[in-house]
Amino acid sequence: MANYSPEEIISLIDNHYDLTEPLRTRMDDDHKLYRLEEFDAGEGYQSYTSNEPQVYADKLIAWMTSAEMIVRIPYGNSDREQRENNDAKEKFLIGMIKAGDERLTMRMQPGIRQQLAWFICLRGWYAGRALLVKDDDGETYVDIQPWDALHTYWGEGKHGLSWACYKTKKTPSEIKAIWDVEVGGEGADLDDDDAIDVYDFYDDEDNIVCTDEMVLKSATKHGGAGVPVFLGPVGSNPLVQAITHTGNLDTVEDY
C-alpha cells in the first residue's frame, strides 16, 4: 500500500465527491421526502405535504427487518462429513451476525439488518465494513459496521474496490476516547460541541484513520483478503452508460 497522508486521502475523497455529487444530492432529496419536509408549490398555489413517502419506506423497512433470515449451504450430493461441515458453516455465519448485532447494541445502534434495511430504502445503496478485530487484550471480536452510502467514498481497480473511506463527524472527546489522541495537541482548548471530520480509510492491506490535519491511527494491517468493505447499488439495474448525460440519475455518470 502507498503510505497515504491525510492530504492525499482528503484529495481522493474530494475528487470522488465531485464525481458522485448528483447521486449524493438524490440521496439527500430522498431523505427530505422521508422526513416530510414541507412541500412548497409556489406563490399563489395551495401546498400539501403527503406522508406517503415515509409510510411506503417504513413498510419496506418493516418487511425486510421482520422477514426470517435464512443462511443455507446446499447439500447436493455431499457425503455425511461434508454435510456436517456445511451445517457448522451456517451456524458460524449466524453466530457472526449475532455477535455483530450485540456489539452494535452496546454502541447504541440498531442491528445490522435494521440499519441496512433503512439505508437500502432511503439511500438506494448498501455499504459497510466487516472485520474480525483483536482488542488490546488479544481477544477477537466481530466488527460489522453498516455505513451510510451518502458519506462513503471509494475507488475501483481491476478486481473490485481498490480503496474505500467512511467520513463521519466526531467531537474531540470522542476522538480522545477512541484513539487516545488530543486533537490540536495536548491542552488544546476545543469546544466539545465542535464537530471534526474523521476519515476511516481502507485499501487492500491497511487501515488509516485521520482528520483534515492529523493521523489518529497510523497505517495498520487489517488482515483482510482485500478491501474489507461491502458496497453497491440496490436492485438489478446495471450501471448503464448513455451516449449523452441524461439527467435521470440512473447512468454510470451518476454513480
Where are these regions (language model features)?
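Extended, helix-rich architectural segments
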Residues: 1-209, 215, 221
